[in-house]
């Protein structure tokens, strides 16, 4: 994935997550591509840890990114099964507080840290990504699972 070029907004958002020390993992299509099956994706999926300090940091990063809406409060990032969407495909950013089949703490401990297009990024590991795809059961996730090494 070393040759992947991230859209400027995605790069900026990842930089802000890093600057604010957010505990996050890149998941979804970008992680699938990183781990060996490059495919089209309509968004960038970011999974964040549910913790008060992390929630505060996520909100700070969002505000600095320009997503400063009254309904985007720390409490959203303290609840499971929440998704915050910004933008429209193919430039949509999605922030998730939980995903199928895996726990954040385990995945963060086993994360892959790499530099993509000049930005240090925390990615879900291949094995945990496969567990997530299998648990999701969606057609596109099962297809990803078949294509991943």
PLM-predicted stretches and their roles:
Residues 1-149:
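Compositionally biased terminal segments of proteins
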């Amino acid at each position: 994935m070393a040759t992947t070029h991230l859209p400027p907004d995605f790069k900026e958002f990842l930089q802000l997550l890093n600057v604010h020390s957010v505990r996050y993992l890149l998941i979804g299509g970008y992680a699938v591509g990183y781990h060996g099956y490059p495919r089209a994706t309509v968004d960038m999926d970011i999974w964040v840890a549910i913790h008060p300090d992390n929630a505060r940091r996520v909100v700070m990063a969002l505000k600095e990114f320009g997503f400063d809406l009254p309904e985007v409060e720390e409490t959203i990032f303290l609840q499971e099964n929440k998704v915050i969407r910004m933008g429209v495909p193919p430039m949509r950013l999605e922030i998730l507080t939980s995903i199928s089949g895996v726990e954040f703490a385990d995945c963060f401990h086993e994360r892959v840290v790499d530099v993509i297009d000049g930005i240090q990024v925390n990615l879900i590991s291949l094995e945990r990504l496969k567990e997530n795809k299998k648990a999701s059961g969606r057609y596109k996730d099962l297809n990803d699972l078949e294509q991943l090494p």
